[in-house]
Amino acid sequence: MKQAFVDKTVTVAVRDTEVPVPKPGQVLIRVVVSGTNPKDWKMAHWRPDAPPVNQGDDIAGYVEAVGEGVVGFKKGDKVAAFHEMLAPYGSFGEYAIAWEHTTFHLTSKTSFEGGKYEPRELTLRSH
């Protein structure tokens, strides 16, 4: 699969990588829409010694696979999720990994574009 990585000079490189396998409690999502936030390019300045990373955290797409113990989702479900910051396999790729507890179903009337904003908005409203 292809992923976009941002390095410390805020240069984006697209690389071929393996499709990840979800671990227990994780959901593998085939990305349809990915959001971007200021932290996606600022992180390179905040952590200049960090390796290039796929920084995208706002995901909307279809469940491709689930890890052991995941019961609320199955392949083909239309979902949105918040990716764990700084973890591998963010939303700037063909597939992304999210935790089950940060993933939720989208209704048939909810667009992927609208759905991808919900994880961040819910986080902001809870603080």
What are these language model-derived features?
Residues 2, 15, 77, 93-94:
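Extracytoplasmic/periplasmic beta-strand context in beta-sandwich domains
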Residues 4-12:
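Extracellular beta-rich ligand/substrate-recognition surface
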